Amino acid sequence: MPADVEAGDLLESLLASLLADFDHWFSRGQALLKQCPDRVLNPDHRKEFAERLVDAQRSIAATRSLLQASSQPMAVSMAAMNPWHGLVTEVWGLAAKLAVDRRHQTLT
């Protein structure tokens, strides 16, 4: 198998895994928002966060479509992925806030 074919297969595999991870965390973020009380995140912030998660999932779907439509291996720029990474970090932050809130609620 030529090296460029192997590199293309590796790139496809890595991107598929990365996009699946983004999907997982964006879905997890939506689930967390549904159980998030107002004392942790007010309704306006929850709505805005949820909208950004939906937009990011649409971007991931569009990226997948472009990758599948291409006859050549393609990469995704860091400029495109940076906002997704930031959003995943926000999901982790929300998970931490909810855990602290749950702990506080059980202690009071």
Regions from the language model: what does each represent?
Residues 1-38:
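Short terminal alpha-helical segments
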Residues 44-86:
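Amphipathic protein-protein interaction modules
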Residues 71-108:
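Amphipathic alpha-helical binding modules
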Residues 19, 23-33, 57-60, 64, ...:
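A structural signal for well-ordered alpha-helices, especially hydrophobic packing surfaces
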Residues 28-31, 35-38, 42, 62, ...:
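Heptad-repeat coiled-coil alpha-helices
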